[in-house]
């Protein structure tokens, strides 16, 4: 039922968006001296880990229902991670300092892909 799919995604997305706001705001307030927005790096990395873990575990070990994938993958983790904030912050930092902006972009990608890789390994049960 398509309408239920939308509600499932919306409910997961609402939770993910609030969690992202809380985590990112908390990290950035604890580390106000940081030269880059660490909150975004952390939410993107954590979200990448859990999405990879969820999807690889669902494919190879424990089949998940369509509703669980929509709720956790598309909804919660989709809203928890934030590509748009990452790109905005990168451009803002590049305007201030090109080196800092590029370093931020590379750090975000490096940490997110590394966490996604470990999520894949753990999701497949290789550890």
From Swiss-Prot:
Signal peptide (from-to): none
Reaction(s) catalysed by this chain's protein: fluoride(in) = fluoride(out)
Q: What modulates its activity?
A: Na(+) is not transported, but it plays an essential structural role and its presence is essential for fluoride channel function.
Gene Ontology cellular-component terms for this entry are: plasma membrane
Which residues are recorded as binding Na(+)? 78, 81
Keyword Ion transport in annotation: yes
Q: How does it sit in the membrane?
A: Multi-pass membrane protein
Family per record: Belongs to the fluoride channel Fluc/FEX (TC 1.A.43) family.
Instruction: Please give the PANTHER family that the UniProt record associates with this protein.
Output: FLUORIDE EXPORT PROTEIN 1-RELATED, FLUORIDE-SPECIFIC ION CHANNEL FLUC
What is the recorded name of this protein? Fluoride-specific ion channel FluC
